[in-house]
Regions:
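Hydrophobic transmembrane alpha-helices and immediately adjacent juxtamembrane helices
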Residues: 1-167, 171-280
């Protein structure tokens, strides 16, 4: 009797794992993983989230309202002069989306993959590798979005979002978080130990400092500017800055497309890696 029940369950799981795209890749249950992460998150330390929220606020107070008093106005990419605080706010908003998404899609994923052995258990159910990828990336996206919304609620009443187009900064931050989370999880799937994880921070810090976050990239030689423009955070900063300052142009469509490509590439490689690691 028990053998019959177990066999029947195995058959049903195998059928579900065939999924909508075949080969056990997708069963349409990514939302269950997001729900699982939320339930686990409710019992975790909220200080982690609070620290991610207050970090950009501290940068704003120190640089925007502190050093900004000494600097005065800054000329943006369209030739308009804005206050220094208004100049760095969209960059800090984009950085918040990036940091929240990267944290969950790298360190948390690394622990689940190599120590918690959670993905092995998940992929033994009806979940497919794309379900896991979408679920984890979706959760990381929500974290990045939460940071961005919290920061917007702080800076908007201060008059640091001069354009009504700034309302679209939240959907923009969602796109940014989705892109970073997708690539972050894909990169993490190749990491074998904590020492290799340090390479992520090694890349993130200079990108944060030199991507037009605190000053225009025009201060650099032309060849360095081209390198910076290729960085995802610079694309994010330019997208959000254009929205919050009301400087809309065709280049913003290119910035958005950049993250669409990031999302597609990240999902593809993450799904491939999870399939190769745990389902082959």
């Amino acid at each position: 009797m028990i053998t019959s029940i177990a066999t029947s369950m195995a058959v049903r799981i195998a059928e579900k794992r065939a999924g909508k795209f075949g080969s056990g890749v997708y069963s349409g249950r990514a939302g269950q993983l997001v729900e699982r992460n939320f339930l686990a998150f409710k019992s975790s330390n909220w200080l982690v989230v609070i620290s991610g929220f207050v970090e950009p606020v501290f940068y704003l107070l120190a640089f925007g309202l502190g050093i900004g008093k000494l600097i005065g106005g800054v000329t943006d990419g369209s030739g308009h002069t804005v206050s220094y605080a208004q100049y760095i706010v969209p960059a800090l908003l984009a950085t918040s989306a990036m940091n929240g998404a990267i944290y969950d899609s790298t360190w948390n994923v690394f622990f689940k993959m190599h120590f918690g052995k959670i993905y092995q258990a998940m992929l033994a159910t009806s979940l497919g590798s794309l379900d896991v990828a979408l679920g984890e990336i979706g959760w990381a996206l929500l974290r990045g979005l939460t940071y961005s919304i919290g920061f917007m609620l702080v800076v908007a009443p201060m008059g640091l979002i001069p354009s009504w187009w700034g309302l679209l900064a939240i959907p923009g931050a969602t796109l940014i978080a989705f892109g970073f989370a997708s690539v972050g999880m894909g990169m993490t799937s190749f990491m074998k130990n904590f020492h290799q994880m340090d390479w992520i921070n090694f890349f993130m810090l200079p990108m944060f400092l030199f991507s037009g976050t605190f000053y225009p990239i025009s201060v650099f030689p032309e060849w360095i500017q081209w390198i910076i423009r290729a960085l995802p955070l610079n694309q994010a900063v330019e997208l959000i800055r254009g929205l919050t300052l009301g400087n809309l142009n065709l280049a913003m469509a290119g910035h958005a497309l950049y993250f669409v490509v990031m999302i597609a590439a990240g999902l593809f490689f993450t799904t491939k890696r999870l399939t190769a690691l745990f389902m082959s």
